[in-house]
C-alpha cells in the first residue's frame, strides 16, 4: 500500500492560501505530483493512504481540493484505503457536501469494510450540524441491513440526534427498526426517549414511552423524572402527574425529596389545602425530612391564600429543623402582608428571620412552573441584576421594596 507525503510543506500551505473555486484541480494535481504517488502511476490497481492530507484539507475548509485528489488518483487506478475513505466522507460531511459524503458512505457500506462506530458517530454529528436528519435515518437503515451487530450503538446515536432536535417521527422510526430486528433498548437509551418525548411530544406519547421503560423493567432516572414532571406541570395535568409519581414509587430515597415535593406542588397549584396538608403528613410518616423546597411550596400556597397562621407555623417548623429561609421564603411573607395592606405587621415576622444574610434562591425551579414568582421575588431579582456589586441583604431588599410600594401608592392617590 502506498502513502502520500503526510506533511504539507511551506510551499504547499502557500499554494492552498491561493485557493479559488476554479483552482482546485490544479492544486490537487500539484499536491499529487510532489508526493510519492507521482512516481507510481501504472495500469495496476493500487491501494493508497492519504487520510492525513484529507484531514488537513478538511480543517482548512478545502473539501473541493480533497475531492479533486480523490478523482485524479482514482482515475489512474490509485484507490483510497478504508482510512482515507472515512477521512474523505467526514471532510465532505463536515463542510456541507452531503451528496459527496453519501457517495463515499455507500461505497463503504457496500464493500467488505465494516464501518467504525467512532467514524459513524462523527458522521452523524456532522449531519446534525447541517440538519440533514434524513441522512442519519439512512445510515441507521443501512447499518440494520448490512451490519446488524452495530445497530444497538448506531441506533442510540441516531435516537440522541433525533430526540434533541425534536425529530420524533424519525426517532420512532429507529425504535421500530430496532423492534423489527429484535434489538432491545438499553436502559440509558430508553430513558432518553422518555426525556425527549416530554420535551417535544404529547403527554400521550410521553406516557407510551414511559410504558416501554416499565415493560422492559428499566428504572427511570432522575433527569427523566424531572422532565416528565415538568411536562405535566406545564399542561396543569396534576392528577396524571400524581398517578405517574405514585407509579414511580414515592419511597425512592436516592431521589431525595423530589417526588414528594412534586406531589405537594400538584396540590398547592390547585390550592387544595387539605390535600396538601395530608400529603405533607404522609411524607413525614414515610420517614422523609422536609427541605427548603418542601416548605416553600407550602409557603407559596399559604401566602396566595392569605393563610397567615399556616405561614407562621411553616416558619416555626423551619426554625426547629434549622432550615434557613431563602428569597422565596421572604417573598411569601412580604407578599402575604403587603397584599392585605399589613406592612406595619411585617417587622414582627421578619425580625425572627435571617434578615442580614445575602439573598439566595435555593428553591427547586419546578416550584415556579405553576406557582410563579411573587412580586417581592421578581422585584428583588431585578434589583440584584441592576446593581450586583452592592452587598445586598434581605433587610436592604425589603427596604427598597417598601419604598417602591409607598411611592407607587402616593402616585396613585395623587391622580
From Swiss-Prot:
Gene3D superfamilies noted in UniProt: Tetratricopeptide repeat domain (1.25.40.10)
PPR repeats: 46-80, 81-115, 116-150, 151-185, 186-220, 221-255, 256-290, 291-325, 326-360
Alphabetic keyword roster: Repeat
Pfam families: PPR
Top-level taxon: Eukaryota
PANTHER family, sorted: OS08G0520200 PROTEIN (PTHR47493:SF1)
Family assignment from sequence similarity: Belongs to the PPR family. P subfamily.
Protein name, entry field: Pentatricopeptide repeat-containing protein At3g42630
Amino acid at each position: 500500500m502506498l502513502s502520500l507525503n503526510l506533511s504539507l510543506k511551506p510551499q504547499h500551505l502557500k499554494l492552498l492560501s491561493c485557493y479559488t473555486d476554479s483552482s482546485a484541480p490544479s492544486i490537487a494535481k500539484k499536491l499529487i505530483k510532489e508526493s510519492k504517488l507521482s512516481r507510481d502511476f501504472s495500469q495496476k490497481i493500487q491501494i493508497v493512504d492519504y487520510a492525513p492530507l484529507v484531514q488537513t484539507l478538511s480543517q482548512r475548509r478545502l473539501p473541493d481540493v480533497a475531492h479533486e485528489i480523490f478523482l485524479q488518483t482514482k482515475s489512474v487506478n490509485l484507490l483510497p484505503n478504508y482510512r482515507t475513505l472515512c477521512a474523505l466522507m467526514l471532510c465532505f460531511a463536515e463542510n456541507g457536501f452531503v451528496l459527496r459524503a453519501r457517495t463515499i458512505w455507500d461505497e463503504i457500506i457496500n464493500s467488505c469494510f465494516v464501518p467504525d462506530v467512532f467514524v459513524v458517530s462523527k458522521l452523524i454529528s456532522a449531519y446534525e450540524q447541517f440538519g440533514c436528519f434524513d441522512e442519519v435515518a439512512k445510515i441507521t437503515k443501512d447499518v440494520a441491513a448490512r451490519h446488524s451487530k452495530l445497530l444497538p450503538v448506531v441506533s442510540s446515536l441516531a435516537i440522541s440526534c433525533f430526540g434533541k432536535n425534536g425529530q420524533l417521527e424519525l426517532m420512532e422510526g429507529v425504535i421500530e427498526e430496532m423492534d423489527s430486528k429484535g434489538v432491545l433498548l438499553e436502559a440509558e437509551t430508553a430513558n432518553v426517549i422518555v426525556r425527549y418525548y416530554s420535551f417535544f411530544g404529547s403527554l400521550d406519547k410521553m406516557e407510551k414511552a414511559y410504558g416501554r421503560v416499565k415493560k422492559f423493567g428499566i428504572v427511570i432516572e432522575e433527569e427523566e423524572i424531572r422532565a416528565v414532571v415538568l411536562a405535566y406541570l406545564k399542561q396543569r395535568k396534576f392528577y396524571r402527574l400524581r398517578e405517574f409519581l405514585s407509579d414511580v414509587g414515592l419511597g425512592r430515597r436516592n431521589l431525595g425529596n423530589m417526588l414528594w415535593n412534586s406531589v405537594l406542588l400538584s396540590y398547592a397549584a390547585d390550592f387544595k389545602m387539605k390535600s396538601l396538608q395530608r400529603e405533607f403528613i404522609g411524607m413525614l410518616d414515610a420517614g422523609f425530612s422536609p427541605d427548603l423546597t418542601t416548605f416553600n411550596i407550602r409557603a407559596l400556597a399559604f401566602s396566595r391564600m392569605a393563610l397567615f397562621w399556616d405561614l407562621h407555623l411553616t416558619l416555626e417548623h423551619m426554625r426547629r429543623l434549622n432550615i434557613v429561609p431563602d428569597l422565596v421564603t421572604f417573598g411569601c411573607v412580604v407578599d402575604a402582608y403587603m397584599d392585605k395592606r399589613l406592612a406595619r405587621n411585617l417587622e414582627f415576622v421578619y425580625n425572627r428571620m435571617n434578615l442580614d444574610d445575602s439573598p439566595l434562591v435555593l428553591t427547586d425551579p419546578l416550584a415556579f412552573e405553576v406557582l410563579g414568582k411573587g412580586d417581592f421575588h421578581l422585584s428583588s431579582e431585578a434589583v440584584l441584576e441592576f446593581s450586583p456589586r452592592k452587598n445586598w441583604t434581605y433587610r436592604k431588599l425589603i427596604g427598597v421594596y417598601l419604598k417602591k410600594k409607598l411611592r407607587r401608592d402616593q402616585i396613585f392617590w395623587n391622580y
